[in-house]
Every structure is written in structure tokens, then in C-alpha cells.
């Protein structure tokens, strides 16, 4: 329940733009947020391995 309220709070327009922080829209995780893909690292990895993100391939060397 707390995560839902934090997600709702993150979507509101704040009085000062500095106070805004990024939160994953899929799971609500506030940390390890990738700005380029607008999701957290865990959701990014899950979707990249499933092939849902275009242009992302698994690295091997």
C-alpha cells in the first residue's frame, strides 16, 4: 500500500522541480532508474532478455 501511495505522489506536479525524483512506472522502484529507458534496472533486464526493448542485445565477448 505504501508503494502505491509513493507512486501516486511521484506523478503529482510538485511546487519545486528540484524535489521531483524518478520512479519506475512498472514496479515503483525509486532506485537504479535508467533515464534513457524510463524504468528500473530490474524491469529493464527482464524486458531486454524477453526482447521487448528494441535495439538492446545481450553483450558477449
Curated annotation (Swiss-Prot):
- Chain sites annotated for binding Zn(2+): 24, 27, 40, 43
How does the cofactor attach, per the note?
Binds 1 zinc ion per subunit.
- Report the cofactors: Zn(2+)
- What keywords are annotated for this sequence in UniProt? Metal-binding, Ribonucleoprotein, Ribosomal protein, RNA-binding, rRNA-binding, Zinc
InterPro entries assigned to the protein according to its UniProt record, in alphabetical order: Ribosomal_uS14, Ribosomal_uS14_bact, Ribosomal_uS14_CS, Ribosomal_uS14_sf
Q: Which Gene3D superfamilies does this chain map to? A: 30s Ribosomal Protein S14, Chain N
GO CC annotations on file? cytoplasm; small ribosomal subunit
Query: Molecular function terms in GO for this entry?
Result: rRNA binding; structural constituent of ribosome; zinc ion binding
Q: Which GO terms describe its biological process?
A: translation
Q: Name one Pfam family in it.
A: Ribosomal_S14
| Subunit | Part of the 30S ribosomal subunit. Contacts proteins S3 and S10.
Q: What does this protein do?
A: Binds 16S rRNA, required for the assembly of 30S particles and may also be responsible for determining the conformation of the 16S rRNA at the A site.
Give the family per the record: Belongs to the universal ribosomal protein uS14 family. Zinc-binding uS14 subfamily.
Name this protein carries in UniProt: Small ribosomal subunit protein uS14
Instruction: Provide the species name.
Output: Anaeromyxobacter dehalogenans (strain 2CP-C)
Q: Which gene encodes it?
A: rpsZ
